[in-house]
Amino acid sequence: MPTVTYREFRLALQRAGFRLVRSRKHETWEKTLPTGEILQVRLSHQMGRDIPTPLFHAMLRQVRLSQAELLALLRQA
């Protein structure tokens, strides 16, 4: 698994339809599903730093993306 930075994760969230709803100590990103369910994840402001692996996997679960889906979003032009 390649390492992913906070900046890259943020870009993938934007491409997946998430929107920034709050930015204080951490950024809060949300996406409302057609069922009305809201997915939410918080990101650190540490743009260029790599996301630690356990935290990365927890964040993927929160946004319901697989590693392959995230990498595909990052490869989009």
Where are the regions a protein language model picked out?
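Basic nucleic-acid-binding interfaces
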Residues: 1-77
